[in-house]
Amino acid sequence: MELIFLGTSAGVPTRTRNVTAILLNLQHPTQSGLWLFDCGEGTQHQLLHTAFNPGKLDKIFISHLHGDHLFGLPGLLCSRSMSGIIQPLTIYGPQGIREFVETALRISGSWTDYPLEIVEIGAGEILDDGLRKVTAYPLEHPLECYGYRIEEHDKPGALNAQALKAAGVPPGPLFQELKAGKTITLEDGRQINGADYLAAPVPGKALAIFGDTGPCDAALDLAKGVDVMVHEATLDITMEAKANSRGHSSTRQAATLAREAGVGMLIITHVSSRYDDKGCQHLLRECRSIFPATELANDFTVFNV
């Protein structure tokens, strides 16, 4: 999987940072996909600066209905239609997302020429496409807000081809059945169980993308053991009380959660517009003093998961 940050500013855009939007390129050889997490104002313009076509988008996940995470959605939906894109699109989001989209389209005289499904979610598993699942966790924010945990299913271990050949199994279609863990019967009547010739399963990758949040009970479950955790660091340690009063987190809180959850990497985003480049490096240093494996997302930064 590959993360591409389209917007990394909190609340309002700056000269160098747009408001929140994150692309997830699934990069699967047989079931690829492009997912978008949040869609702040100007997201479709940011998308033009990447190699990705809006027609490849098949799912959009909205964390909550504050404008800096949402106001780019109607324009993106309409432009997608005006470009002749007919591929279906599904939007997941909290209660009210359907009314927002339908109202924006209706009062502007707009429509989509592609199938559009809107799913209003609650806490719990919201998607399993056979290769990965997505679970929504409730966060601490003035509006109903969710974080999303994306988990790949474990992949089958490598097939021991040499041992199979030694057992008299010819390479070819039978190998595919054995790779799937099935039992086959050879011409001489012997039964070969594929599970006996498979290495241990390869654990799938896991990713946690937080919406806006202050410290909350669900955060640890959302982030526990993931390879990459994306979390806001809106304000520095000295302004922690202010951040929490508005349903946001400080650098210290983001980094402490990453350490307690045992994540592989913390990526901080959603930084206040009060911080210039020097200030953002200060936020990064504060996080790294607690959790060294921290990176700062800038607009168009790409991370591999």
From Swiss-Prot:
Pfam families: Lactamase_B_2. GO terms for molecular function: 3'-tRNA processing endoribonuclease activity; exonuclease activity; zinc ion binding. The active site is at D68. Its cofactor is Zn(2+). Binds 2 Zn(2+) ions. Coiled coil: none annotated. Zn(2+) 2 binds at D68, H69, D212, H270. Gene3D superfamilies: Ribonuclease Z/Hydroxyacylglutathione hydrolase-like. SUPFAM superfamilies: Metallo-hydrolase/oxidoreductase (SSF56281). Zn(2+) 1 binds at H64, H66, H141, D212. The keyword tRNA processing applies. InterPro entries: Metallo-B-lactamas (IPR001279), RibonucZ/Hydroxyglut_hydro (IPR036866), Rnase_BN (IPR013469), RNase_Z/BN (IPR013471). Homodimer. Belongs to the RNase Z family. RNase BN subfamily. This is Ribonuclease BN. It comes from Escherichia coli O139:H28 (strain E24377A / ETEC).
